[in-house]
Amino acid sequence: MLTKRIIPCLDIKEGRVVKGTNFVELRDAGDPVELSKIYNEQGADELVFLDITASFEKRDIIIDVVKRTAEQVFIPLTVGGGIKTVDDFRKILRAGADKISINTSAVKTPELIKEASEIFGTQCVVVAMDVKRNYITNPQNENLKDKNIFETKLGSCWFEVYIYGGREGTGIDAIDWAKKVENLGAGEILLTSMDADGTKDGYDLVLTRAISENTKLPIIASGGCGNSDHVVDAFKDGKADAALMASILHYRECTVNDLKKEVEKNNIPVRF
């Protein structure tokens, strides 16, 4: 079994790290460079920076933050938010990022996935998927014919892809989209459950497992991490390759090392 990864996520707005619940109610969580240094020292396998205002408010990309972080932190850094072109990829990679995450632009212009992977390599292209459960009230609905339906504790649902920072539904089925981005040349999927995001109630294991089982790409589970048990569940039940978390690290509820120790206790390989 490949080593599982623990990845702190830093949502960045106007140069500061913020955290919210269900993609709203944001509060300040610190300086991105300083937090990155802390997580690096704690043993994080990678870092993810998401400029959460970039796609929606058309903000410039956070090149300065990336440069300052890359000068001091030497683990892989993935950067996303408002990246729309191959030139945007190039600028961020030159600033010191190792991978680029795209979401809205991937949905709007899927050929960007193919183009970027051909130029920079598939390992550089991460497709971020913000996904929400769509519960079924009328099973006879004609529009459900092409959807992948899953049974959950709260009822039957399909999983819908959202864009613009979770503000706009696309009608796209998440399973189908995962398969498509794999075929287009994505190297990894960053999978966020909008329902679980910021709740600390655990990852959406039905969603994570569904995507993991329907693509060969590595899956980063995101949204809902509240403790080490949730991370173990993401790996064991969700079949994720990596687990992303924010709140529990930013507010010092635990360290990366704490999480890794608990994961290792469950006979899941991690790197110290």
From Swiss-Prot:
Catalytic activities: 5-[(5-phospho-1-deoxy-D-ribulos-1-ylimino)methylamino]-1-(5-phospho-beta-D-ribosyl)imidazole-4-carboxamide + L-glutamine = D-erythro-1-(imidazol-4-yl)glycerol 3-phosphate + 5-amino-1-(5-phospho-beta-D-ribosyl)imidazole-4-carboxamide + L-glutamate + H(+)
Gene Ontology BP terms: L-histidine biosynthetic process
A Pfam family hit: His_biosynth
EC class (word): lyase
Pathway: Amino-acid biosynthesis; L-histidine biosynthesis; L-histidine from 5-phospho-alpha-D-ribose 1-diphosphate: step 5/9
Positions annotated as active site in the UniProt record: 11, 130
Enzyme Commission number: 4.3.2.10
Gene Ontology cellular-component annotations: cytoplasm
Keywords from the named record: Amino-acid biosynthesis, Cytoplasm, Histidine biosynthesis, Lyase
Primary localization: cytoplasm
HAMAP family: HisF
Subunit structure: Heterodimer of HisH and HisF.
Role description: IGPS catalyzes the conversion of PRFAR and glutamine to IGP, AICAR and glutamate. The HisF subunit catalyzes the cyclization activity that produces IGP and AICAR from PRFAR using the ammonia provided by the HisH subunit.
Protein name: Imidazole glycerol phosphate synthase subunit HisF
Organism name: Methanococcus maripaludis (strain C7 / ATCC BAA-1331)
Gene designation per UniProt: hisF
